[in-house]
């Protein structure tokens, strides 16, 4: 990783944490011998409803030396061991949750319209971008190959599962409401626009405002205020207004119709070309 001139909103990511995260990413590069292509914040700080003690959910994609891809026993395609690697070093921090995917895995999941990867690429808080032109290329091809129905079903499934698991009691955690409301609004946006929804929750609310009653807006504004001031574990009494809105949205059935996308052969050609460009540039 070279020096990055990216500076983020310090209200969401304080400057000292920005530097610590960039240093931690350089440390991972050195320890693992790969090249990080990009790194983004992916959690509540990216969604813009973080608590004072929220984690920093850093997600990155990397590429290895090309020889690693020629072996019948390739290296692991995921880096999930940051806490273990950093233990006892200057980079150890309980608030840092850092996970990376090999570019080959990322492109394979892009073919499957993986919502996590799509959110990373569209995230508002990049910690590092190795090559802005290549990053823009990744974003461009993701928009060409991503199918909206899997994205829609992902958000609907997330909302349904979180509602059943977390919002059935009389006392619930603030953030669990948002883990249902955000994906419901994201699913609405996908259905209405056939495109990727904004990652920032404030922007998402604005572009889906027609589905929100005044009473719901008041309850949601109150929830957001408490959520951003309270600790992650803080709870609240169940809100009947929020629950009624959620239940009504979950009960809605839609007929999702999406036009034809690129053929499997076209997608393969795009992804293979992208992978080869990265190997030529960073695969030594």
Model-derived regions, located:
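Acidic, carboxylate-rich catalytic segments that either coordinate divalent cations
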Residues: 259-284
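Short loop/turn segments at secondary-structure transitions that flank enzyme active sites
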Residues: 62-67, 109-116, 161, 186-187
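Conserved nucleotidyltransferase catalytic core and NTase-mimicking acidic/glycine-rich helix/loop elements
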Residues: 133-264
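Glycine- and acidic
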Residues: 2-11, 166-168, 255-260, 284
